[in-house]
């Protein structure tokens, strides 16, 4: 169908340090599990790439101009399984994830993991971001809770570290936007904007 499909990056994912995240991965996982309990969910399939990156404090280059990576996370009360492409997670990141109780599986493994959930499991899925195949993988006897992801409001409320980093980024951006017109007015007759 598509003659020129974009190639997925082969670059490995990397960890976002606590100096940027402001909250440890284990604490975020605990907060999401508490939200799952509030919703009456036994399992939660995280499907939105930005939510996955935020929750695990990982970043990647799989999508142009967006620091996310392709993957899914199946979170239960006791377990967390990150499903990502082969080679996406290096040994150092793997060890860090394992220290926080996150196991790894193949990207396509999410469907089998969801199908293997026991009868009576209440699976939280955000229908706005979950793909059809995943929604159809929920086994008979399990209940799908099609609700907005609890990660969205958590991501929206910035902690003190995130707020300070946003201030710094806006300051740097403001300086760049202020300098550009000055540079533009000083162009010589033979120069173009591309020369800046």
Q: Can you annotate each of these PLM segments?
A:
Residues 1-5, 185-192:
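Conserved small/polar residues in nucleotide/adenosyl-binding loops
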Residues 46-49, 126, 150, 178-182:
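Short coil/turn segments at secondary-structure boundaries
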Residues 114, 166, 172-179, 187-191:
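C-terminal structured domain segments across diverse proteins
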Residues 54-55, 133-134, 179:
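Phosphate- and divalent-cation-binding pockets in alpha/beta enzyme and binding domains
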């Amino acid at each position: 169908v598509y003659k020129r499909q974009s190639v997925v990056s082969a670059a490995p994912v990397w960890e976002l340090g606590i100096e940027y995240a402001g909250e440890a991965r284990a604490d975020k996982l605990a907060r999401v599990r508490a939200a799952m309990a509030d919703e009456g969910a036994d399992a939660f399939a995280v499907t939105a790439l930005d939510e996955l990156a935020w929750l695990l404090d990982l970043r990647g280059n799989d999508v142009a101009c967006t620091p996310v990576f392709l993957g899914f996370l199946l979170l239960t009360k006791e377990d967390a399984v990150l499903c990502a492409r082969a080679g996406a997670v290096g040994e150092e990141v793997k060890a860090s994830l394992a220290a926080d109780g996150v196991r790894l599986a193949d990207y396509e493994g999410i469907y089998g993991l969801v199908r293997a959930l026991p009868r009576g499991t209440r699976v939280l899925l955000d229908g706005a971001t979950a793909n059809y195949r995943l929604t159809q993988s929920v086994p008979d006897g399990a209940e799908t809770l099609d609700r907005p992801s609890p990660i969205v409001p958590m991501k929206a409320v910035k902690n003190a570290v995130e707020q300070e980093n946003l201030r710094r980024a806006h300051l740097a951006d403001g300086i760049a936007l202020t300098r550009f017109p000055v540079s533009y007015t000083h162009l010589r007759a033979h120069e173009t904007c591309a020369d800046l």
